[in-house]
Amino acid sequence: MFNPVKCFYRVRARPQISPNDQTKSRQITKCQHPRLGKASFFRDPYAKLPNRIPPTVESKNGQLLNQNLIEILDIQIKNQYICGKFSVRKMKEYKKRVADQILSDKLESSGAVLIEGPKYCGKTTLASQQAGSILSMADPERLSQNLALARTNISRLLAGKTPRLIDEWQIAPQFWDAVRNEVDKRDEDGQFMLTGSAVPPKPKKDEYGNIIEEEKIYHTGTGRISRLKLRPMSLWESEDSTGDVSLGHLFENADTVDGESHIDLDRLAFLTCRGGWPKAVLRKKEKASLAQAFDYFDSVVSTDIKRVDDVERDEELARRIMRSYARNQGSQATVGTILADIKNNGDEQMSDATVYSYIKALKEIFVIEDSTAWNPNLRSKTAIRTSDTRYFIDPSIATAALGLGPKDLINDMETFGLIFETLAVRDLRVYADALDGKVYHYRDKNNLECDAVVHLRNGSYGLVEIKIGGTDLINAGADTLTTLAEKIDSTKMKRPSFLMVLTGIGDYPYRRTEDGVLVVPIGSLRD
């Protein structure tokens, strides 16, 4: 017999409802429980559940009650029968990421995984797909309570079904050592996931310069905490690439390529300005999709660049530095070069050290991701340039910094080509991660340059020239690749697995008969 009580408990669905299901609800029965009161439930429409549901697992604060039943918030129940109003609501669409499998593999081999990357790139959403329970440190309703627990009884915050996701963990840096110690105690893999948009903050100090113990990170986490860098979506992840050409397959057999691409110049310009931000990808209207990059840029210069290390920085100067960085995408511009560019576009006096501090802060919040130099064994003693190549982590940051839209890029093909290179490098990095690889850049004293070298852990590598399209540019890229390949001393290292000109536009991929160079439109590439 159920006795009515005046109380209401929030219940939410597990994220397994088909995105095609429309919001609807149906009344099963009206009754109340003496402890639970009135209850509303969201359930999978395909699950066959009785009117009375016997949850078999104790639940609190969002942990699961049963494998395919419900989640319940702010209440603790065990072996109670619940009934009430069942509803089905449309869940947010989740586009699969290349990093899904990478994260799964890391959870099987490490006690904890740190997921890093820029704000808005989908770190929390990625981790939530594999999380057993979630702690959101940025939740304003619980922030004060969570911070207090982090200082006094952090083990309570670590308790929960594994893998336990701790979102925005850097708000309380004590989590780093606590997770490391807990992993040691449990001696099991796949216990925790940590997500955040910045590197761990520097320890806070008191008025005498002493590190405050609560904020101090003592250990690196080596051997216990694995790292995963998540970038904005590649074209394959956003479903803008057909995926007919697999980068991984090219390392096994590059004799033939086949497929097609549906990206023309107008579409490429839009994709470059939109970027790979998940919210922008999911938005149906182009204007709304393009706004995401500008919102991100404004947030970086007005707030994020200051919060990363609690240093007050000038918003306008941050804008000018990022604009200069955008103009130097794909180059080895020094800090001095960027400084000179800023001075040419303004009157303010500043030093190399000032520019460097801003660039360093932008790297710490994953806005900038430069490409390091590749140093192969060559037949001749050619001096290799070791300067990093300048890139933002996503091309839309460059277009937002310069205030450009798709039409502006088409009207300035030189700038378009430079920023497209950033898009191509972003995608290559995403795909290389799935292959245990990294992307480098090559340039020697004779200015022989290769835009991207995809180098795998096993020593295999591929040489890539990035061109927006056109016969002349493709021919020039192929000549560069064959020249560099001939310089490599194959007695000391492997021959390249493939030579590829990665283009922005083109209807289909093909292999050139005269030199074996692959020509692959980016709209056909995948991991």
Task: Give the predicted meaning of each segment.
Residues 135-160:
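Short glycine-rich substrate-engagement loop in P-loop NTPases that contacts/grips substrate
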Residues 52, 504-527:
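Domain-level recognition of nuclease-like catalytic cores that cleave nucleotide substrates
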Residues 126:
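Hydrophobic positions on the alpha1 helix immediately C-terminal to the Walker A/P-loop
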Residues 123:
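Conserved lysine of the Walker
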Residues 177-200:
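Conserved catalytic/switch belt of AAA+ P-loop NTPases
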Residues 71-104:
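N-terminal pre-Walker A segment at the start of P-loop NTPase domains
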Residues 285-460:
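Accessory nucleic acid-recognition modules appended to NTPase machines
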Residues 202-331:
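Interdomain motor-coupling "hinge/lid" segment immediately C-terminal to the ATP-binding subdomain
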